[in-house]
Amino acid sequence: MIKLKKGDPVIVLTGKDKGKVSKIKQIIRKDGKVKVVVEGVNVVKKHLRPIQGVREGGIVEIEKPIDISNVAYYDEKSKRPVKVGIKYVVEGNKISKVRINKKSGEIIDKVWEKIKKEV
């Protein structure tokens, strides 16, 4: 189960960009593997051939995906990487699925909310 989502602040744990803090731009699921594109991380130069009437040729910088295991959720209050957990909260007749900070126990955000059916 993926506990991170688009727009989350993350810190890079390994590689040439180790220690960089940024936000997730995209999550890619392919062949049972999960990769993420992080803003300003794993930037490479790509040489593009010109296509007449479509684009100019040249060198452009693009962000390549990195494995999700190489990033961790970054808690901006404590300025440290933390593990994210899932918890179900029952309030009256509502059930909410929330993401929590495993270290402090505080709620990061709600994933979904449903109303309990009466039997």
From Swiss-Prot:
One of its GO terms (cellular component) is ribosome. Signal peptide: none annotated. One of its GO terms (molecular function) is rRNA binding. Keywords: Ribonucleoprotein, Ribosomal protein, RNA-binding, rRNA-binding. Disulfide bonds: none annotated. InterPro entries: KOW, Rib_uL2_dom2, Ribosomal_uL24, Ribosomal_uL24_KOW, Translation_prot_SH3-like_sf. SUPFAM superfamilies: Translation proteins SH3-like domain (SSF50104). It holds the Pfam family ribosomal_L24. One of its GO terms (biological process) is translation. Gene3D superfamilies: 2.30.30.30. The keyword Metal-binding does not apply. Part of the 50S ribosomal subunit. Belongs to the universal ribosomal protein uL24 family. One of two assembly initiator proteins, it binds directly to the 5'-end of the 23S rRNA, where it nucleates assembly of the 50S subunit. This is Large ribosomal subunit protein uL24. It comes from Sulfurihydrogenibium sp. (strain YO3AOP1).
